[in-house]
Amino acid sequence: MNSQDLKKRQEKIRNFSIIAHIDHGKSTLADRILEKTETVSSREMQAQLLDSMDLERERGITIKLNAIELNYTAKDGETYIFHLIDTPGHVDFTYEVSRSLAACEGAILVVDAAQGIEAQTLANVYLALDNDLEILPVINKIDLPAADPERVRHEVEDVIGLDASEAVLASAKAGIGIEEILEQIVEKVPAPTGDVDAPLQALIFDSVYDAYRGVILQVRIVNGIVKPGDKIQMMSNGKTFDVTEVGIFTPKAVGRDFLATGDVGYVAASIKTVADTRVGDTVTLANNPAKEALHGYKQMNPMVFAGIYPIESNKYNDLREALEKLQLNDASLQFEPETSQALGFGFRCGFLGLLHMDVIQERLEREFNIDLIMTAPSVVYHVHTTDEDMIEVSNPSEFPDPTRVAFIEEPYVKAQIMVPQEFVGAVMELSQRKRGDFVTMDYIDDNRVNVIYQIPLAEIVFDFFDKLKSSTRGYASFDYDMSEYRRSQLVKMDILLNGDKVDALSFIVHKEFAYERGKIIVEKLKKIIPRQQFEVPIQAAIGQKIVARSDIKALRKNVLAKCYGGDVSRKRKLLEKQKAGKKRMKAIGSVEVPQEAFLSVLSMDDRCQEITKPNRLVFRGELLWAYMTKKLIIS
């Protein structure tokens, strides 16, 4: 193709994403668009086609963004090239959404005709507006008995501020309104800007590791053209590679002769090392480089931290390689090596939220076949010392000595909760119990209320979402943004077994709840830890001060069983001998700690119950994460 043909082709390209709250019909709409454009044959078609991960199908959620090319012949007789980028809906995967939107010019906003606007709907709209995208409202599920499209149309106009007079009324499940959506994409989504004759500038929005071809880059071509045989250069580190293949996804990878301005596809260049590429980098040609890199992505800071350890210590290097490969595919994952006296060598990992953490653990176990132990999650605290230094601490074991601490700041989030009016009282009570500060409350319509609180992230991390769902019978929707750090009365609580600190059981707690939580944990550990041949004291301590204690009584053999009567001094001698042996055993003995002990730090009440699947626990119906039953020896 010559330059003129490429420019005409560029005018026929439409790049768009589908954004929505969880379960509003994003993936189903994507399926119907694939069917309507005959991208996938009826034989290959299946529900959630773009959700290629087993985990996505099982949970019914989208975790990874997916890019796919479609051809659509519009009513004007012209054939258009659509690039559809499917996005996740959960708050933990906002980073995936932001990267998808940066590769688009338009976004289809899907809103459930029965449920209306929810918290994540707003969050995704703001992301789309930040990227200056053309937003096309679609009111989905109009065939539901509870559907009220007119109410939702007014909500879109009043709450978001979009003109919804031309919003498409659709049912992705029944295939209603799909053609109208496609025509609106042609008419309203602008063609990509960019110059095909300019030096190559391609934005890496995702990447994946292939055992045979190395790192495969998923790119949006902003300017220029790239084809097999070109020598490309990474603008962040200057490294060069020879392109072996370029192509598109349909959704299978299909090789092409070139990728030009406006295209979304993949580039394979025998990139062997994971560290050579990063999401948000700009690719250019080595012999005709662009003058400057594209504006990349804002790096997402992890909000939740947890330790990940291999059950078999010889799998440490395998775990490192697995995390590196996952990081390539999930740029928001961060990790660094750490050592625990109880758990050995592992990694301190940073996640965007609890679901993100759960998904990473399951991917490590499934895709890389590594059995893991995870510690309870924590957040990043700012510890100000008496030397006027500020230390960022995400691991309780790294907390400085209490005598050196001047004050501690913890992260607060702005929590936005949308809930029916009848549950407002329950939401406010829960938020205040979690140390939240009321900000404002707005009525979306006659029945639905938007409540905003400032809540410590540490309270959100544990069980806030589960308790919110149970107290509102599942009707609440919830979204949060990082707000600020505030000074709080926080203390580090250590758990001592037989007088020894167990670093993996330490946690940070507000001073007001320290005694209560310490007491709950020692009682739980008493039930979980098996009885030993000697008495084991379990203590909860803040610094040198013991705030709670419970003892596991020793297993005791009846040494008097053979004494049928006889002198009492003989019995006393046997009992004294047993007592001395127990004392000696206590001094040198070790305590077996089952893995459930680490979970007890997390679940502070008794509503944690087991389900039929082994080694898993549920909290109010929500799967937290898998814990292995390996027993650990605390010397």
Swiss-Prot record:
All residue ranges annotated as the tr-type G domain in the record = 11-193
Q: Where in the cell is it found?
A: Cell membrane
SUPFAM superfamilies, alphabetically? EF-G C-terminal domain-like, P-loop containing nucleoside triphosphate hydrolases, Translation proteins
Q: Which Pfam families match?
A: EFG_C, EFG_III, GTP_EFTU, GTP_EFTU_D2, LepA_C
Which residues of this UniProt protein bind GTP?
23-28, 140-143
Highest taxon in the source lineage: Bacteria
Q: Which GO terms describe its biological process?
A: positive regulation of translation
Write out the entry's keywords from A to Z: Cell membrane, GTP-binding, Hydrolase, Membrane, Nucleotide-binding, Protein biosynthesis
Name where it mostly resides: membrane
- Tell me what topology the record assigns in the membrane: Peripheral membrane protein
InterPro entries in alphabetical order: EF-4, EFG_II, EFG_III/V, EFG_V-like, EFTu-like_2, G_TR_CS, LepA_C_sf, LepA_CTD
Which reactions is this enzyme annotated as catalysing?
GTP + H2O = GDP + phosphate + H(+)
Which cysteines share a disulfide bond? none
Q: Does the keyword Protein biosynthesis apply?
A: yes
Kindly state one GO CC term assigned in the UniProt record: plasma membrane
- State which Enzyme Commission number(s) the record gives: 3.6.5.n1
Q: What class of enzyme is it?
A: hydrolase
Any single GO molecular-function term of the entry would be: translation elongation factor activity
Q: Which family does it belong to?
A: Belongs to the TRAFAC class translation factor GTPase superfamily. Classic translation factor GTPase family. LepA subfamily.
What's this protein's function? Answer: Required for accurate and efficient protein synthesis under certain stress conditions. May act as a fidelity factor of the translation reaction, by catalyzing a one-codon backward translocation of tRNAs on improperly translocated ribosomes. Back-translocation proceeds from a post-translocation (POST) complex to a pre-translocation (PRE) complex, thus giving elongation factor G a second chance to translocate the tRNAs correctly. Binds to ribosomes in a GTP-dependent manner.
Under the heading HAMAP family, the entry gives: LepA
This protein's name: Elongation factor 4
List the top taxonomic levels of the source. Answer: Bacteria, Bacillati, Bacillota, Bacilli, Lactobacillales
